[in-house]
Amino acid sequence: MSEEIISFTNPALGPLPTKAPQLPSNVLDLFSLKGKVASVTGSSGGIGWAVAEAFAQAGADVAIWYNSKPADAKAEYLTEKYGVKAKAYKCNVTDPNDVSKVINEIEKDFGTIDIFVANAGVAWTDGPEIDVQGYDQWKKIVDCDLNGVYYCAHTVGQIFKKNKSGSLIITSSMSGTIVNIPQLQAPYNAAKAACTHLAKSLSVEWASFGARVNSISPGYILTDIADFADPEMKKKWWQLTPLGREGLPQELVGAYLYLASNASTYTTGSNIAVDGGYTCP
């Protein structure tokens, strides 16, 4: 009898090679989310809403998360427009107890969670950190942009482990790779760099129970989170971006759909940059 081959990174996988999934032969079917349940934080507007609607268009039932902007009407819209089940949930992602409660509610209401997008985030708009008094603003960024992601991942990961499958997608940022100019935002950059590496780290840990973890790093996108930028700052953004403009939220959804669907069953630990080429030069 030949000796068993065991993984160096995940011995819990058992004897190698692992079994490949059975996939549809039609490429369009690979991108279908029919029969899946998706949960998207920060989805009352901006990137999160674009992703939630795209998932509904692909056939998924969708749980929308909001904090300050009620999204019940948007959930109703998804149901009426695309014939999927949709419901809005209010949650403060900086509160781990609230996160756990909402994720458990979603599992109860929908039966499970197959896809989770940790997207909620806030921007740093206070300039050079050395000029900021105290640590409240730092804590605000880290609590939402990093801790909130971890709280969501830690809780939904339990569901994925139970199901032996699942896809976690973390919205990171090109700011986790580069240092932004002309605006200075060290706390945001640090939080997003941590998000990118958290995704990579979890991808190795969660592979043992069949779940995948990836991140997406948008560049400058036309959403409310960028409203702090004045026209002169945006001109500099355009000059620094090879495509010469900001992106639309709809230009991101293809990457999210890929990572959510069976088109990406061999993709884990990846960070997809959708930044108009900003990080290339």
UniProtKB/Swiss-Prot annotation:
Single Gene Ontology MF annotation: mannitol 2-dehydrogenase (NADP+) activity
tRNA-binding as UniProt keyword: no
Family the UniProt entry places it in: Belongs to the short-chain dehydrogenases/reductases (SDR) family.
pH dependence of activity: Optimum pH is 6.2.
Keywords of this entry: Carbohydrate metabolism, NADP, Oxidoreductase
Pathway in which this enzyme or protein is active: Carbohydrate degradation; L-sorbose degradation
Active site, UniProt feature: 173 (proton donor), 188 (proton donor), 192 (lowers pka of active site tyr)
E.C. code: 1.1.1.289
Binding site for NADP(+): 47, 74, 119, 188, 192, 221, 223
Record carries keyword NADP: yes
InterPro entries hit by this protein: NAD(P)-bd_dom_sf, SDR_fam
Summary of the function given for this chain in its UniProt record: Catalyzes the NADP dependent reduction of L-sorbose to D-glucitol. Can also convert fructose to mannitol, but less efficiently.
GO biological process: L-sorbose catabolic process
The protein's name: Sorbose reductase SOU1
Disulfide bridges in this chain: none
Subunit record text: Homotetramer.
Catalytic activities: D-sorbitol + NADP(+) = keto-L-sorbose + NADPH + H(+)
Gene giving rise to this polypeptide: SOU1
Record-linked Pfam families: adh_short_C2
Entry superkingdom: Eukaryota
